[in-house]
């Protein structure tokens, strides 16, 4: 019985000598922030990797209206820019107007003599970029002809009229002499002259208006010459007319001379438009114009320019994000996300960053969880958190700076004759968009890779910093945790966090506890052996005592044992 008691006491001593079962050790784990539901982003090495935070880089919707602040937006209402320039009677309100962006509506219509412009897109672009319809009348002398031709197709009020910026010349009496007129440009700016030629619907109309069976118009400068012959013939009726007017334009540089020669069918200029160089433009849109502020306008409406990319519309005006084909591109602004597990670590209550992240951290991206004689706790590490944030902050602004530029991208128009040019332009434009789309995806993937790498690096830096502080006073348990072999209260844990921990103070205690643990059982598993040996010896002694009792009882006659063969 004495032996049994000794073995039981030995077993109790084994447990009592375990430093971790009392107040002599502590556990410290390092970890990082995690969220229950992260955001998937793309990196160079992964198509989908989860991060705690990400920012959308693609603006995919407009505000549904065009803002009239930041730019002078002129609503064309029922008028196109060209009709306003020519002086269509119902567009007289736009004479001498200025704009940054002229908005053409789908409801716009012409309400004068039917016309066509062979190079419509170029003229529209030139007038739009000038940003004004400032017009100066000049004293052209037209001798021997009748000026100010009118048409019932072009009403100004109830009276027959014509384009206010053009002078329709017809016969005077029974003659239409050859006209030769010159107009020098003695100014220091370019002048834009608008002129035209009338195509009668029949030979009878031709001779009735111009006497000659076929007229001719030649307009020249030192740099160019255009000769146009009317195409006589019936066309579809428009506003009661089967004839047409073709509109042409000529730019006269400073020091150059405009020369006009004609023997019939001339629609003459009344003066010039002063050309200005600028970033004004024209856009087709049915979005309403409202009082708001935006630096980027699309036909769909204004859009914010706080993102580097947009896929609202290829046509833009102002300081706008680049158009790309992707609907979404997310920039990682947080670390790799590893959602917290329900069962955490070999110590139950805490586990390190290698096993999983920690949800609910509000005071930092990186931090400590600990278990000591005072209980358990958690605290963030502001220094490593700030180091990571400083590197991530500004990423979005840098991407915007690389992609945003003040420019305008107008829609391209080509006549049917220029179909091949149109196809080529569309191919070039599509290629540019494809290239930007690829570059955008690559740029974001590189930035995301850098973000994840640097946040991982900050976690490793914090771990190495802690390991160097603890030295031989603690053991790396793996998984981002340390077992501290001395009593470490909350003040001690705080010194580890703020970098003031002095391992020399605790060195002797830590070494002593470490040797006890190593020598007895914790590290080598001797506890299990001692327990099994103690159990086996106890069972053996119980059997011996029981057998001895039986033999003693037999000798005294208290127990009789009969053996039968």
Swiss-Prot record:
Signal peptide: 1-16
Annotated membrane topology: Single-pass type I membrane protein
Post-translational modification: Palmitoylated.
Glycosylation sites: 23, 37, 53, 68, 78, 180, 300, 498
UniProt xrefs under Pfam families: Hemagglutinin
Main location: virion
GO biological process, one term: clathrin-dependent endocytosis of virus by host cell
Cytoplasmic side: 551-565
InterPro entries assigned: Capsid_hemagglutn, Hemagglutn_HA1_a/b_dom_sf, Hemagglutn_influenz_A, Hemagglutn_influenz_A/B
Cysteines paired by S-S bonds: 29-481, 67-292, 79-91, 112-154, 296-320, 488-492
Annotated site (Cleavage): 344-345
Lipidation (S-palmitoyl cysteine): 554, 561, 564
UniProt keyword Membrane, yes or no: yes
Residue numbers on the Extracellular membrane side: 17-529
Keywords attached to this entry: Clathrin- and caveolin-independent endocytosis of virus by host, Clathrin-mediated endocytosis of virus by host, Disulfide bond, Fusion of virus membrane with host endosomal membrane, Fusion of virus membrane with host membrane, Glycoprotein, Hemagglutinin, Host cell membrane, Host membrane, Host-virus interaction, Lipoprotein, Membrane, Palmitate, Signal, Transmembrane, Transmembrane helix, Viral attachment to host cell, Viral envelope protein, Viral penetration into host cytoplasm, Virion, Virus endocytosis by host, Virus entry into host cell
HAMAP family for this protein: INFV_HEMA (MF_04072)
Other comment: Major glycoprotein, comprises over 80% of the envelope proteins present in virus particle. The extent of infection into host organism is determined by HA. Influenza viruses bud from the apical surface of polarized epithelial cells (e.g. bronchial epithelial cells) into lumen of lungs and are therefore usually pneumotropic. The reason is that HA is cleaved by tryptase clara which is restricted to lungs. However, HAs of H5 and H7 pantropic avian viruses subtypes can be cleaved by furin and subtilisin-type enzymes, allowing the virus to grow in other organs than lungs.
Family of the protein in this entry: Belongs to the influenza viruses hemagglutinin family.
Subunit description: Homotrimer of disulfide-linked HA1-HA2.
Name assigned to this protein: Hemagglutinin
Organism in which the protein naturally occurs: Influenza A virus (strain A/Equine/Kentucky/1/1987 H3N8)
